[in-house]
């Protein structure tokens, strides 16, 4: 036949290709959906569910290769005032912008997650507690010097409290570190 196909073969090949294409699209959608389950809706960074898995993974890695690991706990000071004064929409925008600022302060190999509310956690791979404290101080200063946009363009200044825990000195597992 035409193009070397027997009658009906071209239709079958076209149908098989269409099914394969659909299967690939479904697989991609599933993968994206699964990934979305680990992303915080407001800030677009990882959520607490992902953080728990990532902490387990990083602790195992630190143990296996005898490498340090630091965990930073960040809590915005008096963030309730931002929500009360400017509304939750502005509060969400501030949290989203804060997430961007935090991402700029860490390496790509580090993990930033919104733990909940106005709390964030950062996993610093291959980083001891001493270096973790220096990074925490740099983040604290950066946030304090960043102007966040409030309602009506009014600038909002934030301060942040940061705790640092190191593996293995402060904890040898997720429970001890978080």
What name fits each language-model region?
Residues 7, 129, 133-137, 152, ...:
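Catalytic-core segments of nucleotide cyclases and related cyclic-nucleotide turnover enzymes
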Residues 14, 27, 31-34, 52:
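Signal-transmission coiled-coil "S-helix" linker that connects upstream sensory/regulatory modules
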Residues 14-21:
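Allosteric cytosolic regulatory segments
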Residues 25, 84, 124-127, 144, ...:
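Residue-level recognition of strand-loop junctions within catalytic nucleotide-signaling folds
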Residues 29-46, 60:
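Amphipathic HAMP/coiled-coil signal-transducing linker helices
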Residues 47-70, 80-104, 113-117, 121-122, ...:
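Conserved long alpha-helical elements within nucleotide-processing catalytic cores of c-di-GMP signaling
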Residues 114, 143-160, 170:
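Catalytic core regions of nucleotide second-messenger enzymes
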């Amino acid at each position: 036949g035409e193009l070397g196909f027997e009658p009906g073969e071209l239709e079958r090949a076209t149908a098989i290709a269409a099914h394969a294409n659909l299967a690939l699209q479904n697989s991609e959608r599933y993968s994206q959906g699964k990934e979305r389950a680990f992303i915080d809706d407001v800030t677009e960074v990882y959520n607490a569910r992902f953080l728990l898995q990532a902490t387990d993974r990083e602790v195992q890695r630190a143990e296996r290769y005898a490498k340090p690991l630091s965990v930073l706990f960040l809590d915005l000071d008096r963030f309730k005032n931002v929500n009360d004064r400017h509304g939750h929409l502005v509060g969400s925008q501030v949290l989203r912008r804060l997430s961007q600022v935090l991402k700029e302060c860490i390496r790509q190999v580090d993990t930033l997650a919104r733990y909940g509310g106005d709390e964030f956690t950062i996993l610093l791979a291959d980083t001891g507690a001493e270096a973790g404290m220096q990074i925490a101080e740099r983040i604290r200063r950066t946030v304090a010097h960043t102007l966040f946009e409030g309602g009506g363009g009014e600038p909002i200044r934030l301060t942040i409290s940061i705790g640092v825990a190191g593996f293995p000195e402060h904890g040898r597992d997720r429970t001890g570190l978080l």
